[in-house]
């Protein structure tokens, strides 16, 4: 059988620990037998990041800007323990954070829904994609512990020296104050990424803040979204048969619990941080969550939403068998290959990606799965497979489709 051809390379970012092992298994078993794979390879494993003083991460992001589509393996973000374990020169930053900043991207997370793994919210039938604004607010805050009585003010000093002053509070005793900010550019980029991704996936877009209480800060987010929507996306949304819907964050939470799913929920930074964990947990498993970084210029980077599965890796190093869920990593590959196929008008590549996703889901629904899914499935008499045999079972399903 002739292999499917590619015209433009994918940017391939390799990673760490157990996900790095799965990465090679997935390529060898599910991709290379069928596709004449073209990739520009970057090793984002912690050892090589350390060797290159993290330059490899910057290079991979630049390549993603150049080619437009990347697929990324999970990577270690070092802490004190990792500094010792890997003998690091310094505590390198999160690769995801570096790439996100360089691409000015928004992260969209969505669950992979399969029969037999029911969400905690019984009416959720379709995935809920969560878009989190990843800049500013409480994550770039400045805080002061107030020692005693006094006046707290918010002061903005323009370049020409003029000042705007607002009283925060007249303290009669000790307390706490916090200053947060965001930028027009960052909010606009977030809005464009959300509208583009909604059109791309043909899903309704919800956005929510607390503009009734935060009449300037949150209202600014609301206004930026509305203005960009009216000016650049309303006609496109109408033509696609999808809608943009704004509501208050508390109303959005209430509506989400009663909804059937099948939409994108855009959130400010803190709301997105909290709600993405709620949504992923309620759908059943973080190992069944996809993640795609979308830039306002239309650049895409696909990865699994989970980490490097450190515990399984240490078992693997001892020669012990692991049953590690590779579904989200497989879907990172299919997402990237599909997008590459769409951009390059390669129907065979798009068809392959869709078929591999269906084969992965069908394998689980036929009762063959990894241990983590066997613990939460409602299916009876399931077969628990090890990491490698699960990937081989997917290939068997794929070949019979």
Task: List each model region and its residues.
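Flexible, glycine/charged-enriched surface loops at secondary-structure junctions
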Residues: 34-41, 201-209, 233-246, 341-353, ...
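N-terminal small/polar loop signature for handling phosphorylated ligands or for N-terminal nucleophile
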Residues: 46-60, 222-263, 267
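Glycine-rich phosphate/nucleotide-binding loop
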Residues: 256-355, 362-363
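Glycine-rich phosphate/diphosphate-binding loop of Rossmann-like nucleotide-binding domains
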Residues: 6-25, 154-247
